[in-house]
């Protein structure tokens, strides 16, 4: 599969000077003409017209059971409207693109991030990992989030780290993950939070798609040269410089995940727990949190879940005290003495099950916690959702609203992604009903559940809708189970 082109490289919607047309990165789906039309819902929030559901079902869209739904841009708060900005800014504000009317708290966090960048407190590149990711700070220099630009993903053209380049040169036959859509990790990150939120798992820190611009991001020489040239033109010939669509570096689209404090890698705590077993009440809490991680990873078919990219917070001195409300705010005020945070979800939502070189197993499957059958608590929480066909369809619609914002979006490929996810949900439903354990869950043969051509394409799923279930018989060359 060819890599989809960068979404940040679209020309602006309205005409402009030649300099505007040659800019390296543009805002796809966010043209200036669209700003006049407020968005009915943020990406990942499908707008549902239940009264017209029957009519839509009869219409029978041939491509997907999902409406096209234009996505416009709305402003995040009245405070942003009141902020006065010059006609031409050297670092163009991204607040117009980061609009979250339905989440004022997140909008405020993004506003603080933008203000910090404007005063010279730039995002700091994270040394770990195989892609360009950055700690984003507020004006007080406190880390508030992690930004992962699309163009700097592991297989992106502007990845500042050489790991994947060496991989591509030295071992091209194993380069990339053939089951994933290239350079859509930022959507996978946001999609994982969407699934987590819909199922009320509360283990993924809030993650959304945003736009940011910073001198510390990795840009090519052409973009930096253009930026310097436009700044020089604005300084020397203001009349000409003011005609540019943008002065400064182009904004980058990517995922922004809220930073969580007090967590360490799971590998660290798992070794601790082996030497010093947890008290029974804490052990039950950890088992519940672990099962939530299993459910999330299995549904989205995370292909990159080791014990080093999920986090655990457990501080013994706080066991007898109330956990800081601010630290637990992102888990809907539900207090836990031990808490798991599922980060690094950028390599999920495959369009087929892994069937080439590697199996990409879930490393948690070999932990002792994976041998314990799913608890009654988790079964009661999850089964009512995933056993409801309308809920599953609703989830697919929300993911459609999110994924379609990418310039390289393809409906057929998206439907393949949903077929894999529906198959995972089917297996999970059966495993929960049968009282299986996470280890037994991953041993169930993989299936895909495709919508048949004769199935209804309406917004509401009826029992008459027909799906085709297919067992995935082809296994990877290196298989773990």
Swiss-Prot record:
Residues 53-64 have a biased composition (Acidic residues). Inhibited by phenylarsine oxide and adenosine. Activation through membrane association is stimulated by active RAC1. Residues 1-82 are annotated as: Disordered. InterPro entries: Lsb6/PI4K2, PI3/4_kinase_cat_dom. Disulfide bonds: none annotated. It is found in: Cytoplasm, Cytosol; Golgi apparatus membrane; Endoplasmic reticulum membrane; Cell membrane. Residues 1-11 have a biased composition (Basic and acidic residues). Its main location: cytoplasm. It catalyses: a 1,2-diacyl-sn-glycero-3-phospho-(1D-myo-inositol) + ATP = a 1,2-diacyl-sn-glycero-3-phospho-(1D-myo-inositol 4-phosphate) + ADP + H(+). One of its GO terms (biological process) is Golgi organization. Residues 161-174, 264-272, 357-366 are annotated as: Important for interaction with membranes. It comes from the Eukaryota. Widely expressed. Together with PI4K2A and the type III PI4Ks (PIK4CA and PIK4CB) it contributes to the overall PI4-kinase activity of the cell. This contribution may be especially significant in plasma membrane, endosomal and Golgi compartments. The phosphorylation of phosphatidylinositol (PI) to PI4P is the first committed step in the generation of phosphatidylinositol 4,5-bisphosphate (PIP2), a precursor of the second messenger inositol 1,4,5-trisphosphate (InsP3). Contributes to the production of InsP3 in stimulated cells and is likely to be involved in the regulation of vesicular trafficking. This is Phosphatidylinositol 4-kinase type 2-beta. It comes from Homo sapiens (Human).
């Amino acid at each position: 599969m060819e890599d989809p082109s960068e979404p940040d490289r679209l020309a602006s919607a309205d005409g402009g000077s030649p300099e505007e047309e040659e800019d390296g990165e543009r805002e796809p789906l966010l043209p200036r003409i669209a700003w006049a039309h407020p968005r009915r819902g943020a990406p990942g929030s499908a707008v549902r017209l239940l009264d017209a559901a029957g009519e839509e079902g009869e219409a029978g869209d041939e491509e997907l059971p999902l409406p096209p739904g234009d996505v416009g841009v709305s402003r995040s708060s009245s405070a942003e409207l009141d902020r006065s900005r010059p006609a031409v800014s050297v670092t163009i504000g991204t607040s117009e693109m980061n609009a979250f009317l339905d989440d004022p708290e997140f909008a405020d966090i993004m506003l603080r991030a933008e203000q910090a960048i404007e005063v010279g407190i730039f995002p700091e590149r994270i040394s770990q990992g195989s892609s360009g990711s950055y700690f984003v700070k507020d004006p007080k220099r406190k880390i508030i989030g992690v930004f992962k630009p699309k163009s700097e993903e592991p297989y992106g053209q502007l990845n500042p780290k050489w790991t994947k380049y060496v991989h591509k040169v030295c071992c091209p036959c194993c380069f990339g993950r053939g089951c994933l859509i290239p350079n859509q990790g930022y959507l996978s990150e946001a999609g994982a939070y969407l699934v987590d939120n819909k199922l009320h798992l509360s283990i993924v820190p809030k993650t959304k798609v945003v736009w940011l611009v910073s001198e510390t991001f990795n840009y090519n020489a052409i973009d930096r040269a253009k930026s310097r040239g436009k700044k020089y033109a604005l300084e020397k010939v203001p009349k000409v410089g003011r005609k540019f669509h943008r002065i400064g570096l182009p904004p980058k689209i990517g995922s922004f995940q809220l930073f969580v404090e007090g967590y360490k890698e799971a590998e660290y705590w798992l070794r601790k727990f082996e030497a010093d077993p947890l008290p029974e009440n804490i052990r039950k809490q950890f088992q519940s949190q672990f099962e939530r991680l299993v459910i999330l990873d299995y549904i989205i078919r995370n292909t990159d879940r080791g014990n080093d990219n999920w986090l655990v917070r457990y501080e013994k001195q706080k066991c007898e005290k109330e956990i800081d409300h601010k630290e637990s705010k992102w888990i809907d005020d539900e207090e836990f003495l031990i808490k798991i945070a599922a980060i690094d979800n950028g390599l999920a939502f495959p369009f087929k099950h892994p069937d080439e070189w590697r199996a990409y197993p879930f490393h948690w499957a070999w932990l002792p916690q994976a041998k314990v059958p799913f608890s009654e608590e988790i079964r009661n929480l999850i089964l009512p959702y995933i056993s409801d066909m309308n809920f599953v369809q609703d989830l697919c619609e929300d993911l459609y609203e999110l994924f379609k914002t990418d310039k390289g979006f393809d409906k057929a490929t998206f439907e393949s992604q949903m077929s894999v996810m529906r198959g995972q949900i089917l297996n999970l439903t059966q495993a929960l009903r049968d009282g299986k354990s996470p280890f037994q869950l991953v041993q169930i043969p993989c299936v895909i559940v495709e919508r048949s051509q004769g199935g209804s394409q309406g917004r509401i799923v009826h029992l008459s809708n027909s799906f085709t279930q297919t067992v995935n018989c082809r296994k990877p060359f290196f298989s773990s189970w």
